[in-house]
Amino acid sequence: YDQPGLALLETFQYFIGNTDWSALAGPDGEQCCHNVVPYARTDGSLVGVPYDFDGAGLVNAPHALPDERLGLRTVRQRLYRGPCRSTEELQAALARFAAVRPQLTALFTDNPRLEARRKNAARSYVDEFFGVLDDPARVTSAFRRNCAP
């Protein structure tokens, strides 16, 4: 995998609160991957494209339940499921989100198809993510506490 792209994918999954994915391992009987499709670029590097977000906290689907092995009470609880990244890799991925913060927020607040209750819930969830990004101690806690060595 292209490592900056993979770090961005991992951070995106944390942003939306999705724990139902793996860019490296598939479910029993499948070699790779789970809710991520690896695509080859023209230079031969792989980029992962995530899909199937019904288990994400941002979506908050009524039928969604957290994986009991993860110790989460609801799908709205975020858990970083990626590897331990260097400070530089992590900061680069987080900077991509910070750079488009107004646009990400507007996706929900300016969407006429969402009812007010869903807009407010989505806005709150997005704001929680940026609250983590705005606090270096919370970044360390969120992205270092459960990362895979």
Residue ranges of model-derived segments:
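Middle-to-C-terminal accessory/interaction subdomains
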Residues: L70, T74-P149
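Conserved kinase catalytic-core segment
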Residues: Y1-P62
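Short secondary-structure boundary/capping segments
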Residues: A64-P66
